[in-house]
């Protein structure tokens, strides 16, 4: 905070205060985890932070397929490629139903032959590039946000699969129900702390 303030800025938003997987899928220690979350909210409010963002997506938070995407002017930025993410889903994660899900893929209502793009990637993807894609999607972005993954994780894809398996019986309605439960539990703290 002092570093930010020394440079003329004010810390006013936290993005993101991670919601644990057990809260999202409704695990046995959900209420305990919600209490921890509520205390974190109180702690942030006590420091003058009254805007807290969160994510309720299973396993993934924000994901990027390239952390150093080159721009024409020589700079770089974070980048997300649906085709590379689909490649990860189909050929690395090997998620059941992935091919069918991507076959029906649309962006803003426009169909896109993502499977043809995935095939092009598959034909040119090196082992090093595949490892970098795993690093970017699983370790770098998810480890940073959720703490579920750590640098040096020996089997990140297997861990990713195990976490995803926790949602096997969680459909959209159940996830929405779990989110409603979470929000109902934290709203009194939002009111109490002006969040």
Give each language-model segment a name.
Residues 12-15, 53-55:
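A cross-family glycoside hydrolase active-site/sugar-binding cleft signature
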């Amino acid at each position: 905070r002092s570093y930010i303030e020394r440079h003329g800025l004010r810390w006013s938003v936290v993005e993101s205060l991670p919601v644990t997987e057990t809260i999202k899928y409704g695990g046995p220690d959900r209420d305990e985890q919600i209490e921890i979350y509520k205390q974190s909210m109180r702690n942030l409010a006590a420091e003058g932070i009254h805007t807290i963002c969160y994510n309720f997506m299973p396993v993934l938070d924000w994901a990027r397929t390239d952390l150093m995407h080159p721009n024409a002017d020589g700079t770089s930025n974070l980048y997300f490629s649906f085709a590379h993410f689909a490649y990860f889903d189909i050929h690395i994660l090997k998620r059941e139903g992935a091919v069918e899900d991507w076959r029906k893929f649309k962006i803003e209502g426009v169909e896109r032959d993502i499977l043809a793009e995935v095939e092009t990637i598959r034909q040119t993807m090196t082992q090093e590039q595949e490892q970098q894609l795993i690093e970017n999607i699983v370790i770098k972005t998810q480890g940073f946000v959720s703490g579920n993954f750590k640098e040096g994780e020996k089997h990140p894809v297997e861990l990713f699969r195990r976490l995803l398996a926790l949602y096997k019986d969680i459909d959209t309605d159940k996830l929405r129900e779990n989110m409603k439960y979470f929000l109902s539990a934290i709203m009194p703290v939002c009111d109490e702390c002006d969040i």
